[in-house]
Design a protein with these regions (language model features):
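Glycine-rich, low-complexity intrinsically disordered segments
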Residues: 2-197
Length: 197
């Protein structure tokens, strides 16, 4: 009978600062979040909404815990995966005209939400009508993609059309939106910056 012993061993630790001069950090302000298409809007609105996106979080995955008990011990296993929500804020500008090509972030997201639930008719939409895909791309100093997340089956679950309105505040209005999605796949671009280590 094979018996595996529980032992404690220290891993070798090596500290060196030689790489510090070559490493280029990924910056929090170099990113683009864009939908492939936005339901209820024309094709130009995906780029328009990406242009005014101010904040966004990256995908996060959590595994539900499952346990099995034997004798005096508990063993842990990974359960079902669960993806977090994506929360974004968008600058809200006054649209220049009534044309669809000049819609504000609030207009675009309202049109999208009406594909999920239309308050005029009371109808709900099919998922194939209101869900789309999106990409969150993080960039290097030269604008090359160094990391990207493709999210599938994404749609808004909450839209706040104006939080904190005040007669004494002249800051730009922002639209807050929360999105759910089915899954995300991380893509690393093959073309890295020439200065990368």
């Amino acid at each position: 009978m094979l018996i595996l012993e529980k032992t404690e061993k220290f891993m070798a630790i090596k500290l060196s600062d030689s790489k510090s001069f070559k490493l280029e950090p990924i910056r929090k302000n170099r990113w683009v979040f864009q939908f492939s298409a936005i339901p209820g809007n024309d094709n130009n609105q995906a780029e328009a909404l990406a242009f005014v996106c101010k904040t966004c979080n990256a995908p996060e995955i959590t595994f539900e815990g499952q346990t099995a008990n034997r004798m005096n011990e508990t063993f842990n296993y990974a359960g079902l995966p669960k993806w977090n929500d994506i929360t974004c804020t968008f600058y809200d500008y006054i649209r220049n005209s009534s044309a669809n090509s000049e819609l504000s972030a609030g207009d675009i997201l309202y049109n999208w939400s009406c594909m999920i639930y239309n308050p005029l008719t009371g109808q709900m939409g099919y998922k194939t009508q209101y869900a789309t895909s999106a990409t969150l791309a993080q960039l290097d100093p030269a604008g090359n993609v160094v990391r990207a997340w493709n999210m599938f089956g994404i749609f808004p679950t909450r839209v706040n059309y104006g939080n904190g309105l005040s007669a004494t505040d002249s800051e730009i209005c922002e639209i807050e939106a929360t999105f759910k999605y089915d899954l995300a796949i991380k893509i690393t671009d093959a073309k890295t910056a020439t200065e990368s280590a």
